[in-house]
Amino acid sequence: MSQLMIDAQQVCKNYGRLEVLKGIDLQVPKGTVTCLIGPSGSGKSTMLRCVNHLEKVNAGRLYVDGDLIGYRERDGVLYEISEKDAAKQRSDIGMVFQNFNLFPHRTVIENIIEAPIHVKKQPESKARARAMELLEQVGLAHKADAYPVQLSGGQQQRVAIARAVAMEPKLMLFDEPTSALDPELVGEVLRVMKQLADDGMTMLVVTHEMGFAHEVADQVVFMADGVVVEAGTPEQVLDNPKEQRTKDFLSSLL
């Protein structure tokens, strides 16, 4: 059984002639947190979206928990799997976007129980009980019957995290989860993410929050221009980077 939750091997992605990912190798062990950092346009979010086949890779292989994502291999040839099979793979991978993506016409608890009931076929009573547990964990049990428009951005993002966790994923992907928030609301979301990490959730996080990366990440990967420039522990990459490109990026944040 693989000890790697994510194993990306020479992953390439292009849009026409534009190469966005140029042979990415990335390994994320189970139960660890990896933060992807780098300038805008470096390919971080594209890489994240390839992990659950929201973007299709053009070359290379990407495995999650030992399963080839998006394709089936036969006699050395890759065949794209059906959207139904891709959705099944995706149901084991939680994803939290920048902009919350909550259903505006459903209450907080309705947002959380929707997928467990319809995708995982859970009884509504079980889904509701679990949703309330998760809302308690993210500090929003008192908002169960509120609508998204009645919540702050930070509260909406905490609901979005609870909604993703309700599907009992083996992996969580975060695409700049705090970038759309007012600065004073960032901390409440990062605290929820840190709690997830402390609970052993495997996480791949695209972020500009260097303090979070330093405190929570097991591995930091610096990307630029579609390649991995440098990877290692937070101390190695953030405190003592070897590559000039990494040093330039980090100094630009100060």
UniProtKB/Swiss-Prot annotation:
It is a peripheral membrane protein. Residues 6-250 form the ABC transporter domain. Keywords: Amino-acid transport, ATP-binding, Cell membrane, Membrane, Nucleotide-binding, Translocase, Transport. GO terms for molecular function: ABC-type amino acid transporter activity; ATP binding; ATP hydrolysis activity. It is found in: Cell membrane. SMART domains: AAA. Its EC number is 7.4.2.1. Disruption phenotype: Deletion of argTUV in an L-arginine producer strain results in a faster and 24% higher L-arginine production in comparison to the parental strain. InterPro entries: AAA+_ATPase (IPR003593), ABC_ATPase_HisP-typ (IPR030679), ABC_transporter-like_ATP-bd (IPR003439), ABC_transporter-like_CS (IPR017871), MetN_ABC_transporter-like (IPR050086), P-loop_NTPase (IPR027417). It catalyses: a polar amino acid(out) + ATP + H2O = a polar amino acid(in) + ADP + phosphate + H(+); L-arginine(out) + ATP + H2O = L-arginine(in) + ADP + phosphate + H(+). One of its GO terms (cellular component) is plasma membrane. ATP binds at G38, P39, S40, G41, S42, G43, K44, S45. Disulfide bonds: none annotated. The complex is probably composed of two ATP-binding proteins (ArgV), two transmembrane proteins (ArgU) and a solute-binding protein (ArgT). Part of the ABC transporter complex ArgTUV involved in L-arginine import. May also transport L-citrulline. Probably responsible for energy coupling to the transport system. Belongs to the ABC transporter superfamily. PANTHER family: AMINO ACID IMPORT ATP-BINDING PROTEIN, GLUTAMATE_ASPARTATE IMPORT ATP-BINDING PROTEIN GLTL. This is Arginine transport ATP-binding protein ArgV. It comes from Corynebacterium glutamicum (strain ATCC 13032 / DSM 20300 / JCM 1318 / BCRC 11384 / CCUG 27702 / LMG 3730 / NBRC 12168 / NCIMB 10025 / NRRL B-2784 / 534).
